[in-house]
Design a protein with these regions (language model features):
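Nucleic acid-binding interface residues in structured DNA/RNA-binding domains
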Residues: 1-116
Length: 116
């Protein structure tokens, strides 16, 4: 199976578009859902290139520790406006606000939330 940039980007955007209000997902979780768990950094690269006018809720994507994008000062405010609270460390509690448990539930397919 060949990884094409366009299909990978489309899959990333598709997943991010489905992250509900008040919830977050990590770069690695997106990569896993696409079926390419080793491409978390590429997910970050793709999202960094997303135009702000795209309408994607990119602010709902955090790193594996729940940390925010360095230098993106608006991200925290956007998440707080959705009711997400932060730990003293500045991280999002992934167990509380992460979407993966809802999506994967009882052993659902890793590609479960992709709706094309």
């Amino acid at each position: 199976m060949t990884l094409t940039t366009d299909s990978f980007q489309d899959d990333v955007y598709n997943i991010v578009a489905q992250v509900p209000y008040g919830r977050v997902i990590t770069y690695g979780q997106i990569a896993t859902l696409i079926g390419r768990p080793q491409t978390a950094r590429l997910v970050g690269y793709v999202l960094h290139g997303a135009a702000e006018a795209s309408g994607l809720p990119c602010h709902r994507v955090v790193n594996a520790q729940g940390r925010l994008v360095p230098g993106w000062t608006a991200q925290r405010g956007l998440l707080e406006s959705e009711g997400i609270e932060f730990r003293l460390s500045g991280c999002v509690d992934l167990r509380r606000y992460g979407v993966m448990d809802d999506w994967l539930g009882n052993g659902a397919s890793a590609r479960f939330p992709l709706q094309k």
